[in-house]
């Protein structure tokens, strides 16, 4: 994709360029390490919150509910969708992939439950917010890129294309437009609604403070931690994160693949702002990196925290009924799962 002409970049684009200058000198653009220098990371996921009673069809069209159907693909009306945050520990780093959210007005609007502050959800893992060194957001939507300012020492990794996408969304002609049958004030199907003021403020706050790396495509941010672009698989600058672990390589997908069941069965999911071809290419990228679908970590899989999503079967209940799962442990790492 060609970069936009300077005259069209706008205020946000200029900030992004300034941020790149600020961080590039200090942090560079990634590096390569020898195989014996690549650690195996410990990995957990925590549930930032849970969207309750979501109609299955709009989330995954191939699973649309058909009244009276005996087909297991079409006899489920609603599902609960977790908002999963990846926690990665190893080497000199503690990394979060996505950060959940805390916009209380959206909490009410979406009918979400089991939300808890991220610092409380990290506590059972023995991690404090100030210990976190890197934040990789799969994309900049409110339920994935909130709470950034809770991590004062962490550097944010965001794609330049995502910043351009945010700028475009905020210049959308009618950002609050909604369908006739949408609830009053509801605007969740329009581009701008993915980027409410608090989220945008926190993303660009990191940039302005010199605590961000603006990524152009692929980048190895630490030994065994590799960002892969998945542009337009959900938003303009979606990105995946490859993680080296004792159970093989994992790839976190955020909403580039919201559902593990979808990537397993090759179905689109969460498609309101998605280029479906690019979503399938994101699926393919995870298959290529991991060798299959088992190690693809999805953001909103309804089967999360159960044996039906094997990656998350070692789970327990955390603050306010949220859930945590232990996915992989590095050599010498103690389990955090309560006995």
What are these regions (language model features)?
Residues 32-127, 131-134, 161-229, 247-255, ...:
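Metallo-beta-lactamase
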Residues 109-112, 173, 266-272:
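Short glycine-enriched, charge-decorated loop/helix-capping segments at active-site entrances
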Residues 13-28:
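Bacterial N-terminal signal peptides
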Residues 112-158:
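Active-site metal-binding motif and surrounding structural segment of the metallo-beta-lactamase
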Residues 148, 155-158, 306-328:
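Short, electropositive alpha-helical surface patch
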Residues 1-13:
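N-terminal secretory signal peptides that target proteins for export/translocation
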């Amino acid at each position: 994709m060609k970069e936009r002409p300077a005259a069209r970049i706008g205020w946000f684009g200029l900030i992004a360029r300034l941020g790149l200058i600020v961080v590039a000198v200090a942090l560079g653009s990634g590096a390569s390490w020898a195989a014996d220098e690549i650690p195996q990371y410990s990995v957990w996921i925590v549930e930032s919150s849970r969207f309750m009673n979501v109609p299955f069809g709009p989330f995954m069209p191939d699973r649309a509910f058909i009244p009276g159907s005996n087909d297991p693909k079409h006899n489920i009306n609603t599902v609960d969708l977790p908002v999963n945050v990846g926690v990665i520990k190893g080497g000199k780093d503690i990394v979060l992939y996505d950060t959940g959210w805390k916009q209380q007005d959206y909490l009410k609007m979406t009918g979400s439950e089991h939300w808890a502050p991220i610092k409380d959800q990290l506590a059972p893992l023995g991690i404090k917010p100030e210990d976190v060194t890197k934040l990789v957001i799969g994309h900049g939507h409110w339920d994935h890129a909130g709470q950034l300012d809770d991590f004062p020492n962490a550097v944010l990794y965001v794609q330049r294309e995502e910043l351009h996408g945010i700028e475009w969304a905020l210049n959308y002609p009618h950002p609050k437009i909604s369908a006739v049958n949408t609830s009053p004030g509801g605007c969740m199907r329009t581009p701008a609604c993915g980027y409410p003021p608090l989220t945008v403020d926190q993303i660009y706050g990191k940039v302005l403070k010199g605590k961000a790396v603006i990524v152009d495509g692929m980048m190895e941010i630490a030994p065994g931690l590799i960002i892969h672009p998945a542009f337009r698989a959900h938003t303009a600058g979606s990105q995946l994160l490859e993680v080296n672990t004792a159970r093989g390589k994992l790839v976190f997908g955020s909403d580039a693949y919201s559902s593990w069941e979808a990537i397993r069965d090759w179905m689109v999911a969460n498609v309101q702002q998605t280029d479906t071809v690019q979503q399938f290419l994101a699926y393919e990228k995870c298959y290529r990196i991991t060798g299959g679908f088992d190690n693809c970590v999805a953001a909103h899989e309804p089967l999360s925290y159960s044996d039906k999503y094997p990656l998350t079967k070692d789970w327990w209940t955390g603050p306010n009924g949220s859930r945590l799962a232990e996915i992989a442990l590095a050599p010498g790492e103690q389990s955090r799962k309560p006995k």
